[in-house]
């Protein structure tokens, strides 16, 4: 079997918002890589056996900070690529000079390649469109580095060491705004570091199945199945690896999208023949949420009850030794970031449930090394439906945070119907994948309306659709007026409890994507 980790790149994180993008670009080329804090122990770097090292960008100024690349990086004899701050600290640590730029540079720029012989610019045109994001600049390269690219505002746009395979760029090749950024990454990783492109979905599936079999043996495994992307892919890979040793527990909270519980059972229990226990807990959740209006309280109640029900059912499964979870690589990085990274962590990751205290279960995380886009590709490779893998994100508490205030059965049913109409029309008009997230929100206020000659006094539904790259920021989706009119008419005519539909035109910031 191919060792997909045999050729790997080590990325040292100096706190850039783009660090995960670097890793994703390296993996897109077909090479495994991992991200670690810049101050990780020298022995760790030495023993990691990387084929090459990438130094990320960062928010600090090199001349004001004691944050440097570990000297071991430059002593191992492996190729090094410094990006933005990474280039600046590398040059400075080799006798160069970095100063604050007269003017910060953020945005697109044209660089001129001065030397493309056997370096990161091999086989590229002399003019390149790149993405700059810096306030400092290299003013002196020192005796060891030469300039291999420049721009109007950044005379030192890229450098190469005269004797060693060390390269630096002032711009960000990892962003999509840098036109041929992937080529630069590929030149470094494949041509300069000499990595074989072993990281692909076929090899990952083969490797994961072998690892799961070796780890689990004949033990039984429990998985909390939600119907979301991560748990669905975990279910599929575990089923291929260990078959009937896997039992999935699907807690139907009653707060899912219309018919979602049935769809989950159809895909996994019927089509894939996976052992799924469906727990109808709708009434328990409604009872627990009665009279509760505060969003945080609702989240806590839903989360705790979910765990309690999962624990009850898991305890009934005899000889279970493992609890599988859908932890992915960005979760791992975020969790590490709370303790180690200089990047601003927006939220920490908490897998629903975690390890129940009274259960002596070992944790199994088959997706731990994969980014979300890789998880989706893995799911396709395992035969899961495209529409399941590329659905819009859905919050853990479900419709519980899309119904403002108290949650009642009639509110849930009303929102499910309205939301389903919105989603159906997005698909029909080929708009679903043009937006990053789209959903309905139930407002517990009544508004007067007229149908025929009759006055109606019913509830309001807000439609929300946003476009976002990372969900940290978002713009409201500029959906066609004719489309919104059609959706509104359908909802008011087909959902009797609704008399008015509004469209949310708030970005993030100042708003959040979800209403609660």
From Swiss-Prot:
<feature type="domain" description="Glutamine amidotransferase type-1">
    <location>
        <begin position="8"/>
        <end position="198"/>
    </location>
</feature>
<protein>
    <recommendedName>
        <fullName>GMP synthase [glutamine-hydrolyzing]</fullName>
        <ecNumber>6.3.5.2</ecNumber>
    </recommendedName>
</protein>
<dbReference type="GO" id="GO:0003921">
    <property type="term" value="F:GMP synthase activity"/>
</dbReference>
<feature type="domain" description="GMPS ATP-PPase">
    <location>
        <begin position="199"/>
        <end position="391"/>
    </location>
</feature>
<dbReference type="InterPro" id="IPR029062">
    <property type="entry name" value="Class_I_gatase-like"/>
</dbReference>
<dbReference type="Pfam" id="PF02540">
    <property type="entry name" value="NAD_synthase"/>
</dbReference>
<dbReference type="GO" id="GO:0005829">
    <property type="term" value="C:cytosol"/>
</dbReference>
<dbReference type="GO" id="GO:0005524">
    <property type="term" value="F:ATP binding"/>
</dbReference>
<dbReference type="Pfam" id="PF00958">
    <property type="entry name" value="GMP_synt_C"/>
</dbReference>
<dbReference type="InterPro" id="IPR022310">
    <property type="entry name" value="NAD/GMP_synthase"/>
</dbReference>
<keyword id="KW-0315">Glutamine amidotransferase</keyword>
<comment type="function">
    <text>Catalyzes the synthesis of GMP from XMP.</text>
</comment>
<feature type="active site">
    <location>
        <position position="174"/>
    </location>
</feature>
<keyword id="KW-0067">ATP-binding</keyword>
<feature type="active site" description="Nucleophile">
    <location>
        <position position="84"/>
    </location>
</feature>
<comment type="subunit">
    <text>Homodimer.</text>
</comment>
<keyword id="KW-0658">Purine biosynthesis</keyword>
<dbReference type="InterPro" id="IPR025777">
    <property type="entry name" value="GMPS_ATP_PPase_dom"/>
</dbReference>
<dbReference type="InterPro" id="IPR001674">
    <property type="entry name" value="GMP_synth_C"/>
</dbReference>
<dbReference type="InterPro" id="IPR022955">
    <property type="entry name" value="GMP_synthase"/>
</dbReference>
<keyword id="KW-0436">Ligase</keyword>
<keyword id="KW-0332">GMP biosynthesis</keyword>
<dbReference type="InterPro" id="IPR014729">
    <property type="entry name" value="Rossmann-like_a/b/a_fold"/>
</dbReference>
<comment type="pathway">
    <text>Purine metabolism; GMP biosynthesis; GMP from XMP (L-Gln route): step 1/1.</text>
</comment>
<dbReference type="Pfam" id="PF00117">
    <property type="entry name" value="GATase"/>
</dbReference>
<dbReference type="InterPro" id="IPR004739">
    <property type="entry name" value="GMP_synth_GATase"/>
</dbReference>
<dbReference type="InterPro" id="IPR017926">
    <property type="entry name" value="GATASE"/>
</dbReference>
<feature type="active site">
    <location>
        <position position="172"/>
    </location>
</feature>
<keyword id="KW-0547">Nucleotide-binding</keyword>
<feature type="binding site">
    <location>
        <begin position="226"/>
        <end position="232"/>
    </location>
    <ligand>
        <name>ATP</name>
    </ligand>
</feature>
């Amino acid at each position: 079997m191919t060792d997909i980790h045999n050729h790997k790149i080590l990325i040292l994180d100096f706190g850039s918002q783009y660090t995960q993008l670097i890793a994703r670009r390296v993996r897109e080329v077909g090479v495994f890589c991992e991200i670690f804090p810049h101050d990780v122990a020298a022995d760790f770097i030495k023993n990691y056996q990387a084929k090459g090292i990438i130094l990320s960008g960062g928010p600090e100024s090199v001349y004001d900070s004691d944050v440097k690349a570990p000297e071991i990086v430059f002593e191992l004899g492996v190729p090094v690529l410094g990006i933005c701050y990474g280039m600046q600290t590398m040059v400075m640590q080799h006798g160069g000079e970095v100063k604050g730029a007269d003017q910060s540079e953020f945005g697109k720029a044209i660089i001129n390649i001065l030397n493309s012989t056997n370096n990161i610019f091999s086989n590229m045109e002399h003019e390149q469109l790149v993405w700059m994001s810096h306030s400092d600049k290299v003013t002196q390269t020192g005796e060891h580095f030469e300039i291999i690219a420049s721009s109007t505002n950044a005379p030192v746009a890229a450098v190469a060491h005269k004797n060693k395979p060390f390269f630096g760029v002032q711009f960000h090749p990892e962003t999509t705004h840098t036109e041929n950024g992937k080529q630069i990454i590929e030149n470094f990783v494949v041509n300069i570091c000499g990595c074989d492109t072993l990281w692909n979905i076929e090899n990952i599936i083969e490797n994961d199945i072998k690892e799961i079999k070796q780890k689990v043996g004949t033990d039984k495994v429990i998985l909390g199945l939600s119907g979301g992307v991560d748990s669905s892919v975990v279910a599929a890979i575990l089923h291929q690896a260990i078959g009937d040793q896997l039992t999935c527990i699907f807690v139907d909270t009653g707060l899912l999208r219309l018919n979602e519980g049935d769809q989950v059972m159809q895909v996994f229990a019927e089509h894939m023949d996976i052992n799924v226990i469906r727990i109808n807990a709708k009434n328990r959740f409604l009872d627990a949420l009665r009279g509760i209006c505060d969003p945080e309280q609702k989240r806590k109640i839903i989360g705790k009850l979910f765990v309690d029900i999962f624990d009850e059912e898991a305890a009934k499964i005899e000889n279970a030794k493992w609890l599988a979870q859908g932890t992915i690589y960005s979760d791992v990085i975020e969790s590490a970031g709370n303790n180690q990274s200089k990047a601003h962590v927006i939220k920490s990751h908490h897998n629903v449930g975690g390890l129940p205290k009274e259960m002596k279960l070992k944790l199994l995380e088959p997706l731990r090394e994969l980014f979300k886009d890789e998880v989706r590709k893995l799911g396709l490779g395992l035969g899961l439906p495209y529409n399941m893998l590329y659905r819009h994100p859905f919050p853990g508490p479900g419709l519980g945070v899309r119904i403002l205030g108290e949650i009642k059965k009639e509110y849930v049913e009303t929102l499910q119907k309205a939301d389903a109409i919105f989603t159906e029309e997005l698909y029909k008009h080929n708009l679903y994948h043009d937006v990053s997230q789209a959903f309905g929100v139930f407002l517990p206020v009544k508004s007067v309306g007229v149908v025929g000659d009759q006055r109606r006094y019913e509830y309001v539904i807000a439609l929300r659709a946003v476009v976002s790259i990372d969900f940290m920021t978002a713009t409201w989706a500029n959906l066609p007026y004719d489309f919104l009119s059609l959706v509104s008419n359908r909802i008011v005519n087909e959902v009797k409890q609704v008399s008015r539909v509004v469209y949310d035109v708030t970005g993030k910031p100042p708003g959040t994507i979800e209403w609660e």
